[in-house]
Design a protein with these regions (language model features):
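N-terminal binding-site loop/beta-alpha segment at the start of enzyme catalytic domains
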Residues: 1-74, 78-80, 365-379
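Acidic (Asp/Glu)-rich catalytic clusters
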Residues: 2-3, 37, 61-67, 71, ...
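Structural preference for beta-strand elements that scaffold enzyme active sites
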Residues: 3-7, 41-42, 69-73, 124-129, ...
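Conserved, mostly hydrophobic/aromatic
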Residues: 8, 28, 35, 43, ...
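Active-site beta-loop-alpha junctions enriched in small/polar residues
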Residues: 11-13, 48, 75-79, 130-135, ...
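Glycine/proline-rich, positively charged
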Residues: 17, 89-192
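Short, flexible, mixed-charge acidic loops at enzyme active sites
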Residues: 22, 83-92, 227-235
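Structured C-terminal cap/extension of enzyme domains
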Residues: 41, 204-379
Length: 379
């Protein structure tokens, strides 16, 4: 099954990523079923979430639902099987030289894909994405021959990448599209009204290479759900507490500038964020994080799912899209990851020096790395 405009990820609900309250097992499963019942037909999971538990939970939630009635997207790439963590950085990428040589890439990918499918309780993905690649994962021919073998074995119909978890990687993503053109079908990127940068640099290359984009975190840390206001108290351990001070206040001020456009169409702020994002070149699906905020005034997570499922078929005008982009412009607000000019030294799993190959990518696509991919100001 092909991608649908709206998608649901197993990181929603706070059990596997620390955003808001962690739902009970019963409510977590019910939310997935509720998403399906309301019309959401793309579901995404990653094997690294609680060492495969998210896969299992998704399989339980979808049990009994006809397999051909939804699009299933898997994500693999962090090697959870030896259980070797790199401290706070989490599990190593499967391409890490400390784990294996390139001639073992294909066997690892086959094993990881099969184990994920087994946990979900099905025999195939509609799409399988490479999770948070390092520089090897983006560019290594042997790694992508291993990915291609999964398609040949009919374990998946399509292939792609899911960069992250932080923002950046623009030139690496484009290089991957070009180097493996015809093999990379889909990619999940960070893109939304509050974060048009740097993801927008990827859009023309995606269109040229026929890559369909899935935009994550369009909700911008939950702000577009409209129940995170100035003075909001986050729960202990919530990932959002690590964001720069004042981000809630600054984000809400921008949302209020965008609100008249949502009011014109009678839509919610989440729906506005999704419609703006879907108006961007090559973006075919949006997958916000659904969060059950703590506190008495929070909106029920089920209501947030309803808003996504009810996304109307509205086309914002070009002027409205530009107004939203201008309000949310975040260029230069952070240090990016991936290949970028601010990094020097030995390559790390999530950032590396700007190579001559990446410089050439930048030149082909009109990107000046030192102007367009560097930190300039706080958000």
């Amino acid at each position: 099954m092909e991608l649908t405009r709206t998608a649901y990820g197993t990181w929603s609900g706070g059990r596997y990523m620390h955003f808001g309250a962690a739902l009970s097992e019963e409510r977590y499963l019910a939310c997935i079923r509720h998403a399906y019942a309301q019309g959401i037909r793309t579901f995404m999971t990653a094997d690294v979430y609680s060492n495969g538990e998210a896969d299992t939970m998704l399989g339980r939630a979808l049990q009994g639902i006809p397999r051909d009635s939804y699009c299933l997207i898997g994500i693999i790439g962090h090697d959870i099987y030896p259980g070797k963590r790199d401290g706070a950085k989490g599990f190593l990428r499967f391409t890490d030289p400390r784990l294996r040589k390139p001639d073992q890439f294909a066997s690892y990918l086959r094993m990881a894909a099969e184990k994920s499918l087994e946990r979900i309780g099905t025999d195939r993905f509609d799409s399988l994405l490479l999770h948070n690649p390092d520089s090897i994962g983006y560019s290594n021919d042997t790694a992508w021959k291993g990915m291609e073998a999964l398609k040949t074995a009919q374990l998946t119909s399509r292939l792609g990448i899911a960069p992250g978890p932080a923002n950046g990687f623009s030139l690496d993503i484009i290089q991957c599209f070009e180097r493996f053109s015809g093999l990379v079908d889909e990619a999940m990127i960070i893109l939304g009204p509050m974060e048009p940068w740097p993801g927008s640099y990827v859009l023309p290359a995606a269109e040229k290479n026929g890559v369909k984009l899935i935009a994550r975190v369009v909700d911008y840390g939950g702000l577009f759900h409209d129940d995170v206001k100035p003075g909001h108290e986050f729960g202990q351990g919530d990932h959002r507490t690590f964001r720069p001070a004042g981000w809630v206040e600054a984000g809400n001020a921008k949302i209020e500038q965008m609100r008249p456009i949502a009011q014109k169409y009678g839509i919610s702020m989440l729906q506005l964020a999704c419609l703006w994002t879907l108006s961007q070149t090559a973006v075919k699906s949006v997958i916000p994080t659904h969060i059950q905020e703590v506190g008495a005034n929070s909106k029920a997570i089920e209501t947030k799912i309803d808003e996504l499922a009810a996304l109307p078929d509205i086309n914002l005008t070009a002027d409205e899209c530009e107004t939203i982009r201008r309000i949310g412009d975040n260029k230069g607000c952070m240090h990016l990851k991936g290949g970028h000019p601010e990094f020097t030294g030995e390559a790390q799993p999530d950032q590396w020096p700007l190579t001559p190959e990446l410089e050439a990518v930048a030149q082909r696509w009109g990107v000046d790395p030192r102007r367009d991919l560097t930190y300039a100001h706080a958000a």
